Amino acid sequence: PTDGCPGWTVRDVVAHCSSALMRIVESRYEKGVFSPEANDRDIAERAEWTNAQVVDELERGMTEAGPVIAKAGGALDLAALGEWVHGGDVRDALGEPGAYIGPGLPHALTLLARITREKGCLPLHADLDDVDEPLTLGAVSGERTPARYIGDAATLVRLYSGRPVAGRTFELAGAEAKELNIFW
């Protein structure tokens, strides 16, 4: 099981990712695509597949989705960020180091800042222990004083993706963790 996606196994996360990436590659965006119900259907469709088939689909999706996402002008960036977060879910479930960090972190933080601004999320000023510059997230409208986060980048990613933060050391003032989740 994975902590980041309750009720899902690591295989389920990989099956979801492979399906989501192939939807992007094939431009299959029916109503409700990427909803929890659609995700569960996609996982169920792959239940009888071998692990090798799921991994093959994931590899194809990872290879072919990048150019499609890049050409979409930002419209698929939330899906790209979600796939990166799911990589962290898998590493976390397997006890591997580097869950929600690694070489992709600077890109993920850039996407997170832009996506939260475009979605009109609550404003937040993040002082990250492991990043030199502070990060401004959300939309600064003047209606709400920006919340403040002090902690590491991995925990910030966990907060914005609705992942568990129990046992993590951080400070969050002016907002509740549940207000930050951009995926549900």
Regions from the language model: what does each represent?
Residues C5-V25:
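Active-site-proximal cofactor/substrate-binding loop regions of enzyme domains
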Residues S19-V68, E96:
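Short, helix-capping/interhelical loops that line the mouth of catalytic, cofactor-
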Residues T9-V10, T50, D152:
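Short, structural beta-strand-to-alpha-helix junction motif
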Residues P1-T9, P67-G74:
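Helix-loop segments that flank and shape redox-cofactor active sites
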Residues P1-D3, P36, G167-T169:
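Short, hydrophobic secondary-structure boundary micro-motifs
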Residues R11-V14, V55, V157:
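Generic structural signal for individual residues within well-ordered alpha-helical segments
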Residues Y29-V33, A70-W184:
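Structured surface interface patches that mediate subunit assembly and partner/cofactor docking
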